[in-house]
């Protein structure tokens, strides 16, 4: 097996809110659409020429362009990406695959999908500053304000400048009928992975959950959720399945309500989310945390590791950290203008180097970044704070001595 191989194009599909299917969520930036669940059958999608080309290139040992995001992340973080996580017998077995060798996949029936990732909708009750209008409907008001009043100058700001021509396209959703029409395929999958938007915000998710419970689904149900909308009856249903919750959090204590901002700022504070986490822990549902290291939470990482140390004691392999943020580039953790501060954090993280993800933070902090990235970060945050009537300095006072106001 070559060192560029990835099993994903044989095992997985990612369904976007408009129904388009791509082989992997990391391929979203490229022309890799393999059909649409509203107009194509599963067999047509999995036999699509894009799927076939990617498979052929990976078997030939080529770095297929579709996988650029993983190559880029491996360069940025010292070798860690979604691809490197997929190339493991543990993962293959977990989703019900037959093995890792390329010869296994050349013989596989193409419709025998083992993992489906689906975003039913971009609907979300939060408008996190590191998110965008493509992932949260709550971002619409801010996006329109950026289009109207923000001075972009020489900075691109990753799509904020581009005017949305069709909001109906952005807000499309997968119909409930998709679940009923394809339940025979869904039930045979080893893993169903749902994100969004926010899954608990979507009626399609609750319909699927009822169907899985009704049919005694035996695979893994994985949710990427902010957890704020979890209700008791939903938790009871999740307990009946092999459920796994990846909790998107990105900040603890006072910072939480800033980086996980509700449409009404402060609606969900740390006490609220901590209570939800404890509730899930008591239900004995497997949880991990999607805490993405970035500039906003640079001074929050150590407190987060301290708070969650008890989880490590209960379950040694529990994920506490996500991959380091690399996009948008103005939010990268290495953009902090003070090298001494970054070196101090690198040293402090040495105590936690046994935690998966810490070394990639240290490596990211050591990466040189253009000096104007800090200016770009301040400019973006100043505008967003004005729009939302918030203040980053209130939550991260350590920034004040470096801050650039408009």
What positions do the PLM features span?
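Radical SAM enzyme [4Fe-4S]-AdoMet core and its adjacent flexible, acidic
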Residues: 1-40, 44-45, 119, 140-143, ...
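Short, intrinsically disordered, charge-biased short linear motifs at domain edges
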Residues: 11-14, 49-60, 112-119
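Local cysteine-cluster metal-coordination motifs and their immediate loop/turn environment
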Residues: 23-26, 63-75, 123-133
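Iron-sulfur (Fe-S) cluster-binding segments and ferredoxin-like electron-carrier domains
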Residues: 28-35, 74-85, 134-142
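Membrane-interface junctions of multi-pass transporters
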Residues: 28-72
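Recognition helices and adjacent regulatory flanks at domain boundaries
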Residues: 77-114, 124-126, 147
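Core AdoMet radical
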Residues: 113-123, 134-174, 186-202, 213-231, ...
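Distinct, well-ordered alpha-helical segments
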Residues: 204-210, 231-238, 300-304
């Amino acid at each position: 097996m070559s060192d560029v191989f990835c099993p994903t194009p044989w095992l997985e599909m990612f369904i976007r809110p408009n129904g388009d299917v791509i082989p992997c969520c990391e391929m979203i930036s490229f022309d890799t659409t393999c059909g649409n669940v509203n107009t194509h059958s599963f067999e047509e999608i999995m036999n699509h020429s894009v799927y076939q080309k990617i498979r052929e290139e990976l078997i030939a040992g080529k770095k297929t362009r579709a996988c650029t995001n993983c190559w880029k992340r491996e360069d940025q973080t010292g070798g860690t990406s979604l691809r490197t996580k997929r190339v493991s017998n543990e993962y293959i077995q977990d989703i019900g695959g037959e093995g890792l060798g390329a010869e296994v996949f050349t013989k596989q029936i193409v419709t025998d999908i083992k993992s489906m990732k689906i975003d039913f909708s971009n609907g979300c009750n939060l408008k996190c500053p590191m998110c965008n209008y493509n992932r949260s409907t709550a971002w619409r008001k801010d996006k329109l304000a950026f289009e109207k009043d923000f001075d972009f100058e020489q900075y691109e700001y990753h799509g904020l400048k581009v005017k949305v021509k069709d909001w109906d396209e952005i807000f499309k959703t997968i119909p409930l009928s998709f679940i009923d029409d394809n339940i025979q395929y869904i039930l045979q999958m080893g893993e169903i992975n749902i994100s969004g938007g926010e899954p608990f915000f979507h009626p399609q998710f609750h319909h699927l959950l009822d169907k899985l419970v009704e049919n005694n689904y035996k695979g893994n149900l994985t949710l990427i959720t902010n957890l704020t909308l979890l209700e008791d009856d939903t938790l009871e249903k999740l307990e009946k399945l092999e459920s796994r919750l990846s909790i998107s959090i990105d900040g603890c204590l006072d910072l939480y309500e800033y980086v996980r901002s509700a449409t009404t700022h402060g609606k969900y504070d740390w006490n609220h989310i901590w209570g939800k986490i404890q509730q899930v822990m008591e239900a004995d549902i497997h949880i991990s945390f999607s805490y993405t290291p970035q500039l906003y939470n640079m001074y929050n990482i150590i407190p987060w590791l301290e708070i969650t140390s008890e989880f490590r004691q209960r379950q040694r392999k529990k994920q506490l950290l996500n991959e380091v943020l690399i996009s948008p580039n103005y939010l990268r953790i290495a953009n902090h203008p003070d090298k001494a501060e970054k070196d101090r954090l690198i040293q402090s993280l040495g105590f936690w180097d046994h935690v998966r993800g810490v070394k990639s933070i240290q490596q990211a902090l050591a990466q040189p970044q253009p000096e104007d990235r800090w200016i770009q970060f301040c400019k973006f945050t100043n505008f967003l704070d004005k729009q939302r009537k918030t203040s980053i300095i209130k939550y991260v006072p350590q920034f004040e001595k470096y801050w650039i106001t408009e």
